[in-house]
């Protein structure tokens, strides 16, 4: 082990970059669908040893001293995001004749840009670097800070945050209800990096003790919470989730729209599964209705005829506002609408956090001059909604809807979840087929249920549609590409272990604690040297 660490530390040039790239790619095995988190106990010690050797020129400027550490982090991040996000290119192959040219920009360009975050993480860590356990604390702080920044800078994209690798199963998910993702990211990197101390004499026992303590607390809290009796349900809701498995090549084909709509109606109207009552709520996926209701008011009549007394449908739609379909001043929203048993739209919630280049074109007027408008997928460019609110369901239950990747933002969900008893996530991951993408998306939605102590109802066009309880356990689900519907009675009893505000404070305190430890040990080492 010491010989291996020594050889890693002495690497430089392309060899150092290659090992950093491979270490980052290896860390992706800790994410869904692989969930092989043991790989992170190899990749992060490798990163620590690479940073040990990334000292720069001692007589140079601060920039020159830190540049090698930044480069190591960038290469680690490039490997991590390239191996973890390659599936994004699948969306461009759905209409390959039009979008295939952009494949390299998506598959390579996005990881290239995101890698700068991890370069910044290792740069920050190197500023606080010291020997032994101090550098582990510094690295944990650097990644924790960077993962937090990744959640909101440049519109935010906290996909595959390192902390998810420490939560592959419900037993290991419960801690996030207290630490939040901010704290979980810090603690995960710290734990994954501790094996780097196996080659050190000093702090080895302390590192081993901290590893046992933190790992035991992580597992123990999960065991206690899962074993604890659930709070008695105040009420329940009979839910049907529909997964139509519509082929994207037909999604907006006018000649098959009626057939798609008939499929949705048929799955919604079928008899309840044995042991289940009539659904009070039916849930359809994102943009599941293949036309505008302004163009097809008869569709609302058909929905009113299909829904029984007291039933409600929540459906993902493209919603038009401001004119007719031919109007140049019309605005379109990626929305969910609530429809009652009379075929009336009683509520609508528009997607607030749109996907850049996927649902709208940033700096559109400028980029249109360069012909980049065609990067925007789908039939229209969407406008962002102004606010999100809970939808009232039968029985006085309130559900908070999140459309597609909105659910990956912990703070976005936590801010609003206090006003609801259910989290609803509608999505269309069919763009990415049976690649790691839909599994990663589902895992992040699953964690939102645990964080907020609320059941999650998820409808996806081609999967994964599921009901998840407040402790992250999958009650029922439909696999990718399966067509069907699931009926579940959802007890309404969950509540967060701590409030969203307290969870955020806890995470920030954990991050600051590791920054303080790293800084103090760095100062102590400098004083000893001088």
From Swiss-Prot:
Subcellular location, record wording: Cell inner membrane
Pathway: Protein modification; lipoprotein biosynthesis (N-acyl transfer)
Gene Ontology molecular functions: N-acyltransferase activity
Residues that span the membrane, as ranges: 8-28, 36-56, 69-89, 105-125, 127-147, 180-200, 204-224, 505-525
PANTHER family xrefs: APOLIPOPROTEIN N-ACYLTRANSFERASE
Gene Ontology terms: cellular component: plasma membrane
Catalytic site positions: 286, 351, 404
Domain CN hydrolase positions: 242-492
Protein name (Swiss-Prot/TrEMBL): Apolipoprotein N-acyltransferase
Name of the top EC class for this enzyme: transferase
Enzyme Commission number(s) of this protein: 2.3.1.269
Gene this protein is translated from: lnt
Any Pfam family: LNT_N
One biological process term in Gene Ontology: lipoprotein biosynthetic process
Gene3D superfamilies listed in its UniProt record: Carbon-nitrogen hydrolase
Membrane topology designation: Multi-pass membrane protein
């Amino acid at each position: 082990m010491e010989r291996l660490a020594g050889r890693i530390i002495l690497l430089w040039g392309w060899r150092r970059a290659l090992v950093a790239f491979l270490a980052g790619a290896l860390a992706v095995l800790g994410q869904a669908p692989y969930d092989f988190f043991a790989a992170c106990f190899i990749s992060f010690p490798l990163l620590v040893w690479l940073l040990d050797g990334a000292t720069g020129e001692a007589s140079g400027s601060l920039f020159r001293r830190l540049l090698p550490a930044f480069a190591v982090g960038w290469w680690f991040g490039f490997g991590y995001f390239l191996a973890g996000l390659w599936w994004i290119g699948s969306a461009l192959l759905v209409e390959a004749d039009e979008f295939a040219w952009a494949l390299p920009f998506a598959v390579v360009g996005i990881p290239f840009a995101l890698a700068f975050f991890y370069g910044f993480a290792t740069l920050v860590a190197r500023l606080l670097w010291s020997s032994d356990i101090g550098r582990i604390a510094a690295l944990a702080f650097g990644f924790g800070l960077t993962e937090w920044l990744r959640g909101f800078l440049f519109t935010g994209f906290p996909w595959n945050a390192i902390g998810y690798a420490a939560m592959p199963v419900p037993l290991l998910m419960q801690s996030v209800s207290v630490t939040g993702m901010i704290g979980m990211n810090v603690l995960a990197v710290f734990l994954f990096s501790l094996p780097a101390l196996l080659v050190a004499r000093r702090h080895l026992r302390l590192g081993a003790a901290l590893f046992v303590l933190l790992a035991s607390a992580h597992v123990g809290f999960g065991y206690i919470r899962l074993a604890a009796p659930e709070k008695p349900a105040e009420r329940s809701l009979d839910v049907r989730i529909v997964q139509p498995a519509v082929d994207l090549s037909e999604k907006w084909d006018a000649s098959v729209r009626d057939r798609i709509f008939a499929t949705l109606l048929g799955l919604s109207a079928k008899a309840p599964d044995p042991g289940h009552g009539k659904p009070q709520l039916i849930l359809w996926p994102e943009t599941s209705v293949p036309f505008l209701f302004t163009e097809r008011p008869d569709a609302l009549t058909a929905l009113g005829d299909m829904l029984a007394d007291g039933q409600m449908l929540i459906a993902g739609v493209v919603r038009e506002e401001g004119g007719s379909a031919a109007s140049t001043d019309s605005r379109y929203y990626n929305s969910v609408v609530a429809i009652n048993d009379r075929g009336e739209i009683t509520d609508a919630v528009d997607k607030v956090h749109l996907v850049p280049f996927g649902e709208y074109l940033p700096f559109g007027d400028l980029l249109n001059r360069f012909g980049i408008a065609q990067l925007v997928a789908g039939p229209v460019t969407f406008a962002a909604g102004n606010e999100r609110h809970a939808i009232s369901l039968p029985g006085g239950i309130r559900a908070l809807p999140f459309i597609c990747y909105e659910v990956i933002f912990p703070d976005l969900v936590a801010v609003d979840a206090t006003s609801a008893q259910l989290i609803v996530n509608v999505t269309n991951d069919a763009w990415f087929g049976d690649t790691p993408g839909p599994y990663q998306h589902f895992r992040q939605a699953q964690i939102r249920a645990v964080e907020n102590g609320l059941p999650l109802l998820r409808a996806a066009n081609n999967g994964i549609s599921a009901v998840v309880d407040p402790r992250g356990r999958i009650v029922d689900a439909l696999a990718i590409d399966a067509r069907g519907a699931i009926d579940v009675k959802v007890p309404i009893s969950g509540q967060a272990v701590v409030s969203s505000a307290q969870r955020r404070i806890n995470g920030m305190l954990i991050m600051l604690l590791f920054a303080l430890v790293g800084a103090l040990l760095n100062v102590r080492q400098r004083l000893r040297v001088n």
